[in-house]
């Protein structure tokens, strides 16, 4: 009897040890692309027998009454050229260092009572009423938070300023916040106020703004890149943009972004762009596309950060996909405030083919931290920042002990308050075709391997219905252009130029066609969109 109990006890102990070992093994596997490696073996071996490589030129089956193509973008020409190295005229473009400037913008002002108020978020009295000389502001009455330089400033209304019996005002410290801004200084945007940040009560304005570095890999998302530059151009201090002469699939491609930088297309933002050139394709990337996908971000981070000069440990690093655009207010908050934790993510509005097909939920991907954490915890590797939990990294405890900051991951925005936009497959039909044939060999099924999926008429039908390549159909209605955070402001202000992203070009509901035409102005915008623009601009 005792022997049986002893054996039973040993069996339970062995089962417990096996369970613990399995859990450790499973935890280790969760950080290795093991399923992807398995998935990448069979499809490639078999597909080469059944499918030829995709043709370079988009193929469209002829159909009567076929709608005209919206645009002929730069990338519609054949990308399968010999690998291109930088020309002599711009051969140093990918070797030049970038000196980060100091941000001298005066974001905050002080009230005469000693309060610190964020200018864009505070209600100010621009035109004093007659007979109230106490509301007039002189140069010597206000000073910037950032330094001794004194400038004429508008009078900052305080939350507790009240008229006394004889017309005198009592001065208090608080600021009166405009809609969308919160906190004692009116510098906390809604996407932070309604986020899961656990240290909101510790937020304080900085004396010196951080510099913000935004890193992106680019293939042919030039319209979305233009939108990013206009959305974030005044708050981001350096855009680190990586371009390769190979697609994610390993095929040669021309360096179109480098060409656009040198021919003046992006002249308005050229002074803030650090160009990174990846001139090789990683070994094994053709067999396992995730190797190539990860390597692009690793190279982008390491080469880009190594060429940044005047970099400080508390500067902010944000790495995005080209179709992920953070909202300006959230990025500006990270620049101007102390007290938030790291790493951080953005809740982004999800859409497909254009902003008109809104998808449920949000995209929430960890994409930012300080330069200090990027170097000390993630080993200067952007893909680790996006895909690895910080507490699995070996040096995170040392970083906490050295800095005195407890690492807590949080996200700007919420499922109800978007902090950016993720516009997936947002191209013209030709652009979607190019994305199909350029896609990595790891995100299966790889739809670019199927000839019928590359047909332009089929692609147009997907845009019209919101369907997917596997035959599933959209189960949610088109988005309303008048809704908050429908699209970045630059898109709405240039409606005609980006109409293919804002309106479904292949679908016109019969019941609303005439009514929509009656509500459109001379610029082609609907009354709802015009009203929204008037509100935002006012």
UniProtKB/Swiss-Prot annotation:
Which sequence ranges are listed under topological domain Cytoplasmic? 1-7
Q: What is its main location?
A: Golgi
Keywords, comma-separated and alphabetical: Glycoprotein, Glycosyltransferase, Golgi apparatus, Membrane, Signal-anchor, Transferase, Transmembrane, Transmembrane helix
Region annotation Disordered: where it falls in the sequence = 121-151, 509-538
- Pfam families, per this entry? Glyco_transf_17
Q: Which residues lie on this side of the membrane: Lumenal?
A: 24-538
InterPro entries in the cross-refs: Glyco_trans_17
Pathway membership, UniProt: Protein modification; protein glycosylation
Q: How does it sit in the membrane?
A: Single-pass type II membrane protein
> How is this protein organized at the quaternary level?
Interacts with MGAT4D.
Identify this protein by name.
Beta-1,4-mannosyl-glycoprotein 4-beta-N-acetylglucosaminyltransferase
State the organism named in the record.
Answer: Rattus norvegicus
Encoding gene, per UniProt annotation? Mgat3
């Amino acid at each position: 009897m005792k022997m049986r109990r002893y054996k039973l006890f040993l069996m339970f102990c062995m089962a417990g040890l096996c369970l613990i070992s399995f859990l450790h093994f499973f935890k280790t596997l969760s950080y290795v692309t093991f399923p992807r490696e398995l998935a990448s073996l069979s499809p490639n071996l078999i597909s080469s027998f059944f499918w030829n490589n995709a043709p370079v030129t988009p193929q469209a089956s002829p159909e009567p009454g076929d709608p005209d193509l919206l645009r002929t973008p730069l990338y519609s020409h054949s990308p399968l050229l010999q690998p291109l190295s930088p020309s002599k005229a711009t051969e140093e473009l990918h070797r030049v260092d970038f000196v980060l400037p100091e941000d001298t913008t005066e974001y905050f002002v002080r009230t005469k009572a000693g309060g610190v108020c964020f200018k864009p978020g505070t209600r100010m009295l621009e035109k004093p009423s007659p007979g109230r000389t106490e509301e007039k502001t002189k140069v010597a009455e206000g000073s910037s938070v950032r330094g001794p330089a004194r400038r004429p400033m508008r009078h900052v209304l305080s939350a507790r300023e009240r008229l006394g019996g004889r017309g005198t005002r009592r001065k208090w410290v608080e600021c009166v916040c405009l809609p969308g801004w919160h906190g004692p200084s009116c510098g906390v945007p809604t996407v932070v106020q309604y986020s899961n940040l656990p240290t909101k009560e510790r937020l304080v304005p900085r004396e010196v703004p951080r510099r913000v570095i935004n890193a992106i890999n680019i293939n042919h998302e030039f319209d979305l890149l233009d939108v990013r530059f206009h959305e974030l151009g005044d708050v981001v201090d350096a855009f680190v943009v990586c371009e390769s002469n190979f697609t994610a699939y390993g095929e040669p491609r021309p360096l179109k972004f480098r060409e656009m930088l040198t021919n003046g297309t992006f002249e308005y933002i050229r002074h803030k762009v650090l160009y990174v050139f990846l001139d090789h394709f990683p070994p094994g990337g053709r067999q396992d596309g995730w190797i190539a996908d990860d390597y692009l971000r690793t190279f982008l981070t390491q080469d880009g950060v190594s060429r940044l000069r005047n970099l400080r440990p508390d500067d902010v690093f944000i790495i995005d996909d080209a179709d992920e655009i953070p909202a300006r207010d959230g990025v500006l908050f990270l620049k101007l405030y102390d007290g938030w934790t790291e790493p951080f993510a953005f809740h982004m509005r999800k859409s497909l083919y254009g902003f008109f097909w809104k998808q449920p939920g949000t995209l929430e991907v960890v994409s930012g931290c300080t330069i200090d954490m990027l170097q000390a915890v993630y080993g200067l590797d952007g893909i680790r920042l996006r895909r690895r939990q910080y507490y699995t990294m070996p040096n995170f405890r040392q970083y906490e002990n050295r800095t005195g900051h407890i690492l807590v991951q949080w996200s700007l925005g919420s499922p109800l308050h978007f902090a950016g936009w993720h516009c997936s497959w947002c191209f013209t039909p030709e652009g979607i075709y190019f994305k199909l044939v350029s896609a990595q060999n790891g995100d299966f099924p790889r739809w670019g391997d199927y000839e019928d999926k590359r047909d332009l008429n089929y692609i147009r039908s997907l845009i019209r219905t919101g369907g997917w390549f596997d035959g599933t159909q959209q189960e949610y209605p088109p988005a309303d252009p008048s809704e908050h955070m429908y699209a970045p402001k630059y898109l709405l202000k240039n409606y005609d130029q980006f109409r293919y992203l804002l309106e479904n070009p292949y679908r016109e509901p019969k019941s609303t066609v005439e009514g929509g035409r009656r509500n459109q102005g001379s610029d082609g915008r609907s009354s709802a969109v015009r009203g929204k623009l008037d509100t935002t601009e006012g």
